[in-house]
Swiss-Prot record:
UniProt keyword Oxidoreductase present: no
Source organism of the structure: Streptomyces coelicolor (strain ATCC BAA-471 / A3(2) / M145)
GO biological process terms on file: amino sugar catabolic process; N-acetylmuramic acid catabolic process; peptidoglycan turnover
EC number, UniProt record: 4.2.1.126
PROSITE patterns per record: GCKR, SIS
Top enzyme category: lyase
Pathway annotation from the record: Amino-sugar metabolism; N-acetylmuramate degradation
UniProt name for this protein: N-acetylmuramic acid 6-phosphate etherase
Classification via SUPFAM superfamilies: SIS domain (SSF53697)
Amino acid sequence: MTSTPHHPDLRSQLETLTTEAFRPELAEIDQLPTLDIARLMNGEDATVPAAVAERLPEIAAAIDAVAVRMARGGRLIYAGAGTAGRLGVLDASECPPTFNTGPGQVVGLIAGGPDAMVTSIEGAEDSPELARADLDALALTADDTVVGVSASGRTPYAVGAVEYARSLGALTVGLACNRDSALAAAAEHGIEVVTGPELLTGSTRLKAGTAQKLVLNMLSTITMIRLGKTYGNLMVDVRASNEKLRARSRRIVALATGAADDDIERALTATDGEVKDAILVLLADVDGPTAARLLAESGGHLRAAMAAALG
């Protein structure tokens, strides 16, 4: 089946999107000196945080809802195509080393599968059926959250993922960069960060992509803070999988406890390198197994485990 008959309709849709708008004042940008183009681009990028700031109440409400589900064992699943999909995969892939999340706890789905991370997969973004199949492969539950990500807010893969997830009782979030988007309307929590026309007409990897990155940073990071994955602003659930991270682990324990280096090494040895446990050993003067038990009983929240140990 050819998709040619849909092209006029799609063109008219795109022409109504702010992210696709043409800016005649930039029509001769290619004639400018490089530094002037860089200044223009930097000025455009500087507008993105303000656009995100306008949506902070919606972002916070979504985060609180996600944290409730994840505390029950649910997963955070991003679904998008192209740049939006890649940003979701990026955010998901950074959660295990940063927050010691379990395998599959934060998932990035991109239309067309892993190959689409580096290669354009023709037609994949136009398939809501593909989104349903990808979610079926994850055996979605009502405790899971699906975040559809699409600059236009109309990408069939992202909209299809959200609609299907919602039909199964999962929590849904729709992140778009245009007002009145189908994606935000389909989701329980709609977040529309309107970044305006791009420097290059329709190149939504620019301001829209930056906005999506900022919002995804918030979704994962603040959710993990709510889940007790941090102690203050320290990454106490960091996974020490290489020498840099092992050094960071020692530094985090030092910052949290003020203990001497020898004491930190002993605590990390006694807790098999677990930063949270080592901090509890040092601050509450308990042994490794007791620290592990207290943390398990407090759902991994270090402050709660500390209160139990000292109370």
